[in-house]
Design a protein with these regions (language model features):
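Extended, alpha-helix-rich binding/interface surfaces that flank or overlap catalytic cores
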Residues: 2-19, 36, 53-69, 73-182
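Short, charged N-terminal beta->alpha structural module
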Residues: 19-51
Length: 182
């Protein structure tokens, strides 16, 4: 249905068209917003093929918004380098960090170092600044299908109760029966 998000068999929840702060949704109220400028990339089509209903919206920052908390900026290698060269990269990352509780950058494709003639050291410096100085995680993605898979994983995580990821215990800390289950 129009204006709703569907993730697998999860109940549908209306999409929000603004990024104003709101109460944290329950695990059953997963919302995904896609900036209308992102639709030509093919990621929205990939999400639709996975059962997610998306509707275009205009996000002031970022390309995807999950549950009003996770803001995702998607950049191809060429986009990343182009943003470095025109001076907009760090402004975009700073705005993403200020706007969302959990900002993420998805770096898509394998052309980061070949898209343009830019010193690899400069690219690595920008990557280090984004993660080290701004604290924004960078998730690598090979293509639009993998980007959709990453967004699906983020959607699934947001369905769960908020909290840190649960790490599996080290093998030596488990009984033989527990090791078989893991």
């Amino acid at each position: 249905a129009r204006g709703q998000t569907r993730l697998g068999d999860a109940p549908r929840a209306p999409l929000q068209s603004d990024t104003t702060a709101e109460a944290t949704p329950t695990a059953e109220e997963v919302r995904l917003q896609v900036d209308h400028r992102e639709f030509p990339s093919g990621v929205a089509r990939e999400l639709a093929q996975r059962g997610v209903t998306v509707a275009p919206t205009q996000l002031p920052v970022g390309d995807y918004l999950i549950d009003g908390r996770v803001g995702v900026e998607r950049k191809t290698g060429a986009d990343f380098v182009g943003s470095m060269l025109d001076g907009s990269l760090f402004r975009q990352v700073k705005a993403l960090k200020q706007q969302f509780r959990r900002p993420l950058l998805i770096l898509e494709g394998d052309d980061l170092y070949t898209a343009r003639r830019v010193e690899p050291k400069a690219i690595r410096g920008a990557l280090a600044a984004i993660t080290g100085d701004f604290g924004v995680p960078i998730l690598p993605s090979a293509n639009t299908a993998e980007t959709a898979d990453l967004l699906m994983a983020l959607l699934e995580r947001s369905r769960r109760e908020p909290g840190p990821a649960q790490l599996r215990p080290a093998a030596g800390e488990l009984s033989p029966e527990e090791q078989q289950r893991h």
